[in-house]
Design a protein with these regions (language model features):
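OB-fold nucleic-acid-binding modules
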Residues: 1-15
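Divalent metal-coordination and catalytic microenvironments
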Residues: 19, 65, 169, 277
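OB-fold single-stranded nucleic acid-binding module
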Residues: 24-34, 45-48, 54-102
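Extended, charge-rich, solvent-exposed interface segments
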Residues: 82-147, 223
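A short mid-domain helix/strand-loop element embedded in enzyme catalytic domains
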Residues: 128-172, 194-198
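Divalent metal-dependent catalytic cores for phosphoryl transfer on phosphate-bearing substrates
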Residues: 153-155, 164-165, 175-293
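N-terminal intrinsically disordered, cationic/polar leader segments
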Residues: 274, 281, 291-317
Length: 317
């Protein structure tokens, strides 16, 4: 069993532990020497590792997605923990406990799915209700939804993260619509449910979280529109305009062309969905960022957001 985890590694600590190699890249220094940069992960997070000596020899002994035993020294570099590696050895899978290596949601996936289904079964629109039930009846889709990560890196990047994010978004929708008149709540809830459903096919997550070929070539927006279109076509008399408005929610929810949406939000429901999706993703990412250093009130620098964040310490009731 694994005894030392990435989140527990401290500055100047000697490390001898098992990890999953999530990324492996080869580089050359200015003096012409080879080195390796590794992303090592376990269920608590990841740590960057560098192999400066014997990089070619060591690198031939393992590949990306291998389980490995790593020996090295931890150092704090620019606010992030890093390993200077002395040796890497591939480990046979029979010696591995898979639950040690992929992080997962703190919440029970079956309980989250049941809460999500309860919310959607409260919809009054019979066509959207039929679409929801068609999705629930798809056992493979539900199996993947219970397991899929919310993203590869930015927010909810762990098993069942997609379901956690989707449920959180739908609960936010329920609260926000109370403040506005004229919003199609059922359409918005269904959009919240389906907005990232294509990620169950975009990612592979049997070891590290990575993209499938379809995820690389198409992306989840295209894949989920295709999936939803097929399910709608199997429902008798599903209104054409309703299908159009629902698919608009899916393709516009990233909110901007530069973030991958082919269309900007052009309905009130689309604006709400994009805004709440963005909010939930950012809050989760910020709350789960590592400290700049142990005990610091500041997080490490977040490259996607271009800043560090100050954490206010709240008193427990």
């Amino acid at each position: 069993m694994k005894s030392l985890f990435a989140a527990d590694i401290r500055d100047n600590q000697a490390v001898d532990a098992m990890f999953l190699v999530a990324a492996k890249t080869h580089g050359v220094t200015k003096t012409g020497n080879s080195y390796l940069t590794l992303k090592l992960i376990d269920r608590t997070g990841d740590i960057e590792a560098r192999v400066w000596e014997r990089a070619d020899d060591i690198g031939r002994g393992f590949d990306k997605n291998d389980f490995v035993r790593v020996r090295g020294q931890a150092t704090l570099y620019q606010g992030k923990m890093q390993l200077r590696v002395q040796d890497v050895m591939r480990v046979d899978e029979s010696k591995i406990a898979p639950e040690d290596f992929l992080p997962k949601s703190a919440f029970d996936p079956q309980a989250m799915l049941e809460e999500l289904q309860t919310i959607l079964r409260g919809m009054k629109n019979p066509h959207l209700l039929a679409l929801a039930e068609a999705c629930f009846a798809d056992e493979e889709l539900m199996r993947l939804l219970r397991q899929a990560p919310g993203a590869k890196t930015i927010h909810h990047p762990y098993l069942s993260g997609l379901l956690e994010h989707t449920l959180s978004l739908m609960k936010l929708i329920q609260k926000v619509v109370e403040n506005y008149q004229g919003v199609d709540v059922d359409l918005l809830l269904m959009g919240g449910f389906l907005h990232d459903i294509g990620k169950v096919y975009e990612f592979t997550f049997d070891r590290a979280v990575d993209y499938t070929d379809a995820g690389q070539l198409l992306g989840h927006l295209v894949m989920e529109v295709e999936m939803v279109t097929k399910k709608i076509e199997a429902i008798a008399a599903f209104p054409t305009e309703l299908a159009l408005l629902l698919k608009h929610l899916l393709v516009s929810h990233h909110g901007a062309y530069e973030f991958g949406s082919p269309k900007l939000p052009q309905t009130v429901e689309a604006v709400i969905l994009h805004s709440l999706d963005d909010l939930d993703g950012k809050i989760q990412a910020i709350q789960n960022m590592p400290e700049k250093e142990p005990g610091s009130k500041w997080t490490a620098f977040h490259r996607a957001y271009g800043r560090s964040f100050y954490r206010i310490k709240t008193e427990e009731p």
